Amino acid sequence: MKPEIHPIYREVVFHDVTSNFKFLTRSTMGTKETTLWEDGLEYPLVKVEISSASHPFYTGKHKLVDTSGRIDKFKKRYAR
């Protein structure tokens, strides 16, 4: 690999501000904020609005849309 052209790949704490969930992973994302992790070490902190901890697809809390009204309206409009 060529020196000085690749971003720094390091451990970073991601904080989902919606669910107040934090997880430690590796990333090239840069930030000026830091936080103290459970192991007592300080890591860069990246705040995110949504992650797998708060996204409806992963949490199973899907918002159900009332489609029965739409179906009835369609049948009523195109009934023969």
From Swiss-Prot:
Complex formation: Part of the 50S ribosomal subunit.
InterPro entries the record matches: Ribosomal_bL28/bL31-like_sf (IPR034704), Ribosomal_bL31 (IPR002150), Ribosomal_bL31_B (IPR027493), Ribosomal_bL31_sf (IPR042105)
Keywords for the protein's UniProt record, in alphabetical order: Ribonucleoprotein, Ribosomal protein
Protein name from the UniProt record: Large ribosomal subunit protein bL31B
A GO-annotated cellular component: ribonucleoprotein complex
Gene from which the chain derives: rpmE2
Gene3D superfamilies: Ribosomal protein L31
Stretch forming the signal peptide: none
Pfam family, one: Ribosomal_L31
One annotated GO molecular function: structural constituent of ribosome
Family: Belongs to the bacterial ribosomal protein bL31 family. Type B subfamily.
Gene Ontology biological process terms from the UniProt entry: translation
